[in-house]
């Protein structure tokens, strides 16, 4: 039965391995499934053996025996004295024993030559037991063990029972931590399962010996299917998943308001000097900032550059002038050339270190680029209706298409025909918008 129990335990472990449970829930389900699988296979093997009267394998032959006491003309066997020549260990219930194996158990009330009388089912030190003997002589009394027994089968059975009880206790604890409703639910489900097992046992007893074990064992294996379902319930998402907070994030994010005030003051001064305006974006949200840090900067919050950001909007012929002044102030300026950009977009991105200790981002765009890349509602807010309508009249194409082209293009292979077709349309679109003196 050891091999069957191990197989059942492995089945239980495999069932849980296919789930996504983690932490305490996974430990409870894994322990419970291993115990259920092993104990169920114990019962299945025992039930089938009893029902079909399957013969047990012979693993050894008893030798010696009492020199002066006989049972049906055969030497009576004594615990602590007589042996089996060897033990083959089959069917993996106990280890191979290539030397004499002592009888370890006998009757506590019947002695032969001062030794407990061995009888059917008395165990050997290897864990095997005596399976044949006299059919008409019975030796009574409780069992006395006179030597250590390497009883792997009994140890495994006891261990699986203990594991099952531990899983039950852990499950009740987790349910209690989850709330009264969860605890009541677990107790109710457990009660139904135990009641069902009892009914199956009663039905099996009516059919004959062995059926109780068979029915309960098969039901136990079937119940293993509840393991993955419980894991999925325990791991069911409760709203949107929380983004992991990068180490040092709070310190960096706390500097964003001061950085924003500083770059907004710089942008206001340059816009006033060159007849433009400033689009002041709010500080990037905490959730979006953490996502970007985790995805783009491997969790390093010191590398994010646009917690504080704004855009200076000036006429196209002044974009490069403003960019040069930002560079003179120490900003790292990147000029995006429409002829080199794959989608034809043009503009200026700059990163400026602030006294707050984190960088801020200042973009420089012409009204035409704002018209092209922003939605109409946003572009009208940034430019004002008069400027928006004037750009629209010069461009002769609808606004806001640049961002749409970008979103369609970025999910494709840049070398694919579809991506190249979108890029060509985007370049033509930006060229059309730039007719109105956009950068």
Swiss-Prot record:
GO cellular component term, pick one: extracellular region
Subcellular location per the Swiss-Prot or TrEMBL entry: Secreted
Catalytic activity: AMP + ATP = adenosine 3'-diphosphate,5'-phosphate + AMP + H(+); ADP + ATP = adenosine 3'-diphosphate,5'-diphosphate + AMP; 2 ATP = adenosine 3'-diphosphate,5'-triphosphate + AMP
Keyword flag Nucleus: no
Principal location listed in the UniProt entry: secreted
InterPro entries assigned: PAAR_motif
Presence of the UniProt keyword Nucleotide-binding in the record: no
Pfam family, one: PAAR_motif
Effect of deleting the gene: Deletion mutant in PA14 strain displays an approximately 40-fold decrease in competitive index against PAO1 strain.
Keywords: Secreted
CDD domains: PAAR_RHS
Function: Type VI secretion exported toxin that pyrophosphorylates adenosine nucleotides to produce (p)ppApp. Thereby, depletes cellular ADP and ATP to dysregulate central metabolism in competitor cells.
Official protein name in the record: (p)ppApp synthetase toxin Tas1
């Amino acid at each position: 039965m050891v091999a069957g129990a191990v197989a059942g335990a492995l089945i239980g472990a495999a069932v849980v391995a296919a789930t996504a449970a983690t932490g305490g829930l996974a430990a409870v389900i894994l322990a419970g499934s291993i115990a259920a699988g092993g104990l169920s296979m114990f019962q299945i093997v025992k039930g089938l053996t009893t029902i079909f009267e399957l013969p047990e394998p012979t693993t050894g032959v008893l030798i010696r025996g009492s020199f002066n006491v006989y049972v049906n003309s055969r030497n009576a066997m004594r615990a602590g004295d007589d042996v089996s020549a060897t033990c083959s260990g089959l069917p993996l219930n106990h280890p191979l024993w290539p030397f004499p194996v002592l009888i370890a158990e006998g009757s506590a009330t019947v002695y032969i030559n001062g030794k407990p009388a061995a009888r059917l089912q008395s165990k050997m030190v290897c864990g095997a037991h005596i399976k044949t003997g006299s059919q008409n002589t019975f030796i009574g009394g409780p069992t006395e063990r006179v030597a250590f027994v390497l009883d792997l089968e009994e140890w495994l059975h006891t261990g699986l029972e203990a594991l099952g009880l531990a899983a039950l206790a852990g499950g009740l604890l987790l349910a209690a931590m989850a709330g009264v409703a969860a605890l009541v639910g677990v107790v109710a489900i457990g009660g139904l399962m135990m009641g069902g097992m009892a009914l199956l046992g009663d039905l099996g007893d009516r059919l004959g010996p062995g059926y109780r074990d068979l029915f309960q064992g098969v039901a136990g294996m079937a119940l293993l299917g509840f393991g993955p379902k419980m894991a999925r319930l325990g791991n069911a998402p409760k709203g949107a998943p929380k983004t992991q907070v990068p180490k040092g994030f709070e310190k960096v994010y706390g500097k964003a308001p001061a950085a924003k005030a500083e770059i907004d003051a710089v942008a206001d001064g340059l816009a006033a000097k060159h007849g433009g305006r400033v689009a002041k974006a709010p500080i990037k949200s905490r959730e979006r900032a953490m996502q970007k840090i985790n995805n783009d900067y491997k969790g390093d919050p010191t590398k994010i550059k646009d917690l504080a950001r704004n855009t200076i909007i000036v006429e196209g012929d002044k974009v490069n002038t403003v960019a040069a002044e930002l560079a003179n102030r120490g900003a790292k300026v990147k000029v995006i050339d429409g002829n080199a950009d794959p989608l034809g977009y043009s503009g200026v991105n700059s990163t400026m270190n602030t006294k707050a200790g984190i960088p801020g981002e200042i973009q420089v765009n012409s009204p035409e680029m704002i018209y092209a890349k922003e939605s109409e509602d946003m572009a009208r807010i940034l430019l004002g209706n008069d400027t928006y309508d004037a750009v629209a009249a010069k461009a002769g194409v609808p606004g806001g298409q640049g961002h749409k082209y970008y979103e369609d293009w970025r999910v494709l292979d840049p070398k694919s025909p579809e991506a190249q077709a979108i890029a060509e349309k985007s370049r033509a679109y930006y060229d059309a918008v730039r007719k109105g003196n956009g950068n």
